[in-house]
Amino acid sequence: MKNALIATLAFLVTSLAATPFCHADDAPPNIVLIFADDLGYGDVGCYGATKVKTPNIDRLAKEGRRFTDAHSASAVCTPSRYALLTGEYPFRQGIWGPCHPNSKLLVDTDKLTIAKLLKKKGYDTSCFGKWHLGFGKERNDWKEPLRPGPQDLGFDYYYGVPVVNSAPPYVYVENDRIVGMTSDDPLVYLEPDARENVTPITPLETKHGNRVPNWFGGAAESHKLYNDFTLGLTLAEKATRWIDQRGDAPFFLYLATTQIHHPFTPAPRFQGTSQCGLYGDFIHELDWIVGEVMRALEAKGVADDTLVIFTSDNGGMFNENGQDAFNNYGHEQNGDLLGFKFGAWEGGHRIPFIARWPGRIEPGSTSTQLICNVDLLASLASLTGQPLDEKQQVDSVNVLPALVGEPESALREHLILAPARGSHLSVRKGKWMLIDAQGSGGFGGTKPGGHGFAGPAAASYIGRRNSDIVNGNIRPGAPPAQLYDLQADVNETKNLYDEYPDVVKELRTILQDARSSIMKKTGAVATRNDAPKIPATPGDRSVSFDFESGKLEPWKVVEGEFGHLIGSRDSFFGNGQEYNKQGKHYLTTLEGSADAERGMDSQTGVIVSPLFVPEGGTMTFRVGGGSGDSTYAALCTADGKEVQFVRGVNDQAMQNAEWDLKPYVGQKMFIKVVDASTIGWGHVTVDDFQFDAKVLTDYPDLLKTK
């Protein structure tokens, strides 16, 4: 009898994965989703933190369920938010890094989102806090209305910061309007050479951490309303007021906090309250915000009728304040995991994930199920009794059974995980984790104190052990990729790549299938594997733009300024890996000078080749750098029309690429390199263009050369 009962319960829980959770006579729960920023696995008390106190977050775990194997689909902010809202892996759309402040809306307005899904079931929907997914159809010029935006993705109401607390513009947006802006003083984006006229913003000290200077002029009143030290208080007040104003309809509140993203600017009441400096004080402010939301639900009388989910967009970042918390107070933001934000190691994407729903979720319970933030779409569809079509379930898996029960088997067959670099796209299946390259695939700064300190150097610095790392560097002879048994070795101390070739082969097949789905620009053929480093090699084609003269000529800069376009480095910035160039020289928009010690993404401009007339065949070359809309190489007709183009993969390493020239035989063409980005991965590197053509001595007439 007992065995029969257990079998019946197991069947009922497992069947939830395939059938709607709510029936017609069920009252749908309210849903509150709190999405913290850069909160690491070890930043919360219920996940082992001892230098901070998080009673409100810990209460959610005490009254709900804590997951120990939850992940963000990306170890980076923008793509993680894309995955959360759409249920789609962001790499499929070429989204690898943070979007530029002027970025268009990255989410197709025809795509189903969790807000649209819930709105179809009668939910009131709102979004508060960090957006960082862009506005508008093309480049955002900040002219009102800011559409498409949150309201076009299913949110009835939005109030928050348009980008992030570390990047401009430093203003609030309400729905599709900039709060406090008037028609006679509009917000204006300023080009780099005009930024002496920016509008003043809240002054900060070095101790608060990294913040990008303002790039905008105008909107003086809007800027005055934004204060870094009251940002969290403002968003909490707006969110709780919205809860208080709800009527009888169920509601969905998505609160994307700016805590604990740099700069670390806790309100005065929280300063000095933790045992790990401003880093911990900011966590205390985050915990207070969670408490305010819970108090609002209780005051409204709906706390027991609300599913509350608390999680983070990615792992903790070892920035200046993270280093201060470790060096001076012993706080380990990602617990004993290897790695940090941006990287493929566990510390980059294993995140806190807690769900509370009285009467449905067992209080104080823990789940070891493998889940991901990309799974919320399918899970909320099941919760509200809405079937998804097959296309909408490709990446998002219904993990609701793991929230409300104890499934005996894994709900996910495998999970694709994306760090900042496309070369390090990874796959998790069961206990196995394959990272298809060496190192972390994230930031690679080698010196403590810097904002980008991470990778092997930082791992050694904090005392992590890994069989591939010796004294902060990847050891000579280390395997070309990484395989870890996370069941036996969650800290990723031993790379088993050479010991289990069959497992590597199986997981690599899954990765190859995933890579084949990545959105590519028309006509561009770029591999996801690094091009090999080779010596200067005379080509057998009639044209060779390989920059081996050490000079830019015959190419020209037609827009912007660059410090050192023709590079000759033998190793990459940060991680020290060998530069995979052809010969000695290459063209890059990353280097400010010949002896620069770090990259300079702030440079922008356009570089063009002379005109040429293709004779057929293909053009082969290498491309590296950012994967965003603002950094790319393009093949153009003489009138400037871009007919083929390609981007990097958010990696300094160059990828093989080729363009088919046969459609353009006899036409005047040119190559254009565009860098319009000034933030992370805001650069382009190209090398070794080989093709058959007649090179002309003139340039496109529409471009004024410098």
Residue map of PLM features:
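Beta-strand acidic-aromatic groove motif in beta-rich domains, primarily in extracellular
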Residues: 557-558, 619-620, 629-635, 682-684
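Extracellular carbohydrate recognition and processing domains
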Residues: 636-669, 674-684
